[in-house]
């Protein structure tokens, strides 16, 4: 790959898209100066954590527009002309597509193509013959047959990506007009095809192994070096290939070395998907963990009791920490029903605000923080810890990132924070991360 590599700018719709790279910046704000930090950084890639998956379509659109508007100015001021833009989203196809890619294309303009690349190998998501699969207990299952396709906000009916595109664009892009990059094409090389793409043509890309995407990324970077402009709607694995960063500084099993104190840590669990609940059960069987359940039904039905609830939780946490144990703060596990999607999203904000007030009230000498759930993790970084940016250290488990707060953080200096997506890892994964941090 050539040295005049384009800067890779990732707009991440929840903060877990950096789950396959390391040593780069995650930005929690997108004012011009903060974006320039990312553009000027030595790493070839940086992430802007927009958290749009937790927002309404209208809000997602306006946030994306604001990022792109500021990005245009920041790019000009930094004198950067060669860049790739990635709208990083979910490997199970949930999220605001095509809203985000449409806005990026409108604002930054001139893209020759946009590619859907949802493969995420660490999480068992592969794409073959343009059909996207989730590997469940060793069996590749078309993703439209899983719980994710029935998501109450982002439901869809197709695993065959051209049909997914037609469904999501409401027929604006027809399935037959989608360029399909199959495994055989990718493995032989796609450069000639990439050079011919124009007018923001939609392409869908297969991937069974990291080597497939490495090959595709090589062709993408060559074409970009010749002046082609590309936009991506992808999961995390293509980022590994585009950034090409090599191995992380400290091995996953040794990342407990980043702890600033010898005290216990804290764990916060917001995600309510089935996998998280199973992982939580295993975690609570670990020595020196103590569960603190937050009754979300009570929060919904008696909002006036919120302050009392917060005070009770923080009191429990303080006692647990004093006893040299790790509090595991989690929301009650049932997914509540609401009269409308809007009401559900609004209540999500109420729960998140409570969780973030808990984070702000954690003992100041905790040695680590684990945040479970994508949206929860975003809120922990931007609201709970009020970070402008954080340096990504790497992954403590495949697909599970660790960042560190700055040395001058007012509440938690040099605190390692684990960003653990809701639907990643086996049932022992959360317990494994806890064990690694206790070493």
Enumerate the predicted regions with their spans.
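C-terminal structural cap/anchor segments
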Residues: 310-374
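N-terminal short beta-loop-beta anion/metal-coordinating cradle
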Residues: 19-49, 312-325, 391-410
């Amino acid at each position: 790959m050539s040295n005049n590599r384009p800067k890779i700018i990732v707009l991440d719709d929840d903060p877990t898209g950096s789950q396959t790279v390391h040593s780069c910046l995650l930005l929690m704000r997108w004012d011009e100066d903060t974006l320039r930090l990312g553009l000027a950084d030595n790493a070839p890639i940086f992430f802007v954590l927009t958290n749009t998956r937790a927002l309404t379509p209208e809000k997602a659109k306006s946030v994306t527009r604001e990022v792109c508007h500021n990005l245009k100015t920041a790019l000009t001021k930094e004198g950067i002309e060669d860049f790739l833009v990635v709208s990083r989203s979910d490997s199970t196809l949930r999220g605001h597509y095509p809203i985000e890619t449409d806005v990026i294309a409108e604002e930054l303009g001139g893209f020759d193509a946009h590619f859907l690349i949802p493969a995420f190998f660490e999480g068992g998501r592969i794409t073959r013959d343009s059909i996207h699969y989730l590997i469940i207990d060793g069996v590749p299952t078309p993703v439209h047959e899983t719980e994710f396709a029935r998501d109450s906000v982002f439901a869809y009916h197709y695993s065959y990506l051209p049909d997914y595109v037609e469904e999501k664009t409401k027929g604006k892009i027809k399935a037959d007009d989608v360029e399909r990059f199959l495994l055989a094409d990718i493995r032989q090389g796609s450069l000639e095809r990439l050079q011919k793409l124009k007018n923001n043509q939609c392409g869908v890309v297969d991937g069974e192994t990291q080597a497939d995407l490495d090959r595709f990324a090589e062709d993408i970077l060559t074409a970009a070096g010749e002046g082609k402009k590309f936009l991506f709607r992808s999961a995390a694995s293509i980022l590994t290939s585009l950034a090409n960063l090599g191995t992380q500084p400290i091995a996953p099993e040794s990342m407990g070395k980043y702890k600033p104190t010898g005290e216990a840590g804290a764990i916060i669990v917001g995600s309510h998907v089935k996998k998280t609940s199973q992982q939580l059960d295993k975690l609570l069987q670990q020595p020196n963990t103590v569960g603190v359940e937050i009754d979300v039904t009570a929060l919904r039905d008696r909002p006036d009791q919120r302050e009392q609830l917060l005070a009770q939780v923080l009191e429990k946490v303080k006692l647990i920490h004093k006893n040299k144990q790790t509090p595991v703060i989690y929301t009650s596990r049932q997914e509540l029903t609401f009269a409308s999607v809007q009401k559900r999203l609004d209540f999500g904000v109420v729960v998140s605000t409570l969780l973030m007030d808990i984070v702000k009230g954690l003992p100041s000498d905790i040695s680590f923080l684990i945040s479970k759930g994508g949206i929860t993790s975003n809120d922990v970084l931007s609201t709970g810890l009020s970070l402008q940016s954080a340096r990504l250290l790497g992954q403590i488990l495949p697909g599970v990132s660790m960042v560190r707060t700055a040395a001058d953080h007012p509440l938690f200096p040099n605190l390692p924070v684990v960003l653990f997506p809701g639907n990643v890892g086996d049932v022992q994964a959360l317990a494994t991360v806890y064990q690694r941090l206790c070493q």
